[in-house]
C-alpha cells in the first residue's frame, strides 16, 4: 500500500489527499508533524527517489528560513543534511508519496498519475 506523508494543515497536502481520494487510490496516511521521518527512512527515500537530498527540504517553511538553511546547506555534508531533516518533520518537503519502487516529493498531479496508475 502507498504511504502518504503529509501535514494536514498544508493546502498542497490537502489537494494531494483529495486527488488520491477522488481517484480511489488506497494509501496509509501519516502526519509528518506527529510522526517525524527517521534518519533511516530519509536515507532510504533519498536513495529510492534518485533526487538530491536538498530536494527533501521544505524551503518555503518557517523553520527552514529561521535556521538560515539557504546559506548553511551548501556547506553541509549529505549525512549532516539527512540528520538535520530527521530532527523535525516540518523541515521536510511535503507531501511525500511512497510506493514500493518510487518516492515522490511534492504534489505534481501529472507525475503522481504516472506512478500510481
What residue ranges belong to the model's regions?
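Thiol/selenol-based redox catalytic cores and closely related redox-interacting motifs
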Residues: 34-117
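Local sequence-structure signature of Cys/Sec-based thiol-disulfide redox active-site neighborhoods
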Residues: 1-23, 27-32
